[in-house]
């Protein structure tokens, strides 16, 4: 719930499942991943009180994904490569005019989760479970991810699934993906 992967009502199903488990190796507090204090409030005051506590422990962060515009006629020497290839190609920072904005959304995170943890999660999410209306490629080296933390925007060059290098980036120079063609009736 803290990561936004399920609705709060999912907890009821988890409690039911715990009661029917053959193994009794975990108490309900451990099974739900709650602290003793959270569990006591859950028992004494119910779901609403627990939801309020958990809601106070999470935050929504805006992010954008920028990917290189790749065509059949142009070659980008650092496409799908790490930051050192970008520098070998003569760039100090990713050339924003060669990129397009492919996605902008919010991600739910536990408060206190650092940028690298958020980026690692986005890398997995945008490789394993692409949103239905996502029109970019899976996240890969040479992509740029923007994270917004309370109005402060930070940009990261994707080196690989665990390595994201802070970079300067000018998103207003990026191209927008063309709107999808309307279906003919």
What are these regions (language model features)?
Residues 180-185:
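Non-Sec secretion/translocation targeting segments of pathogen effectors
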Residues 2-57:
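Amphipathic alpha-helical packing elements
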Residues 31, 39-53, 138-173:
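Short, compact, well-ordered microdomains
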Residues 10, 33, 40, 68-70, ...:
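Charged, low-complexity intrinsically disordered segments
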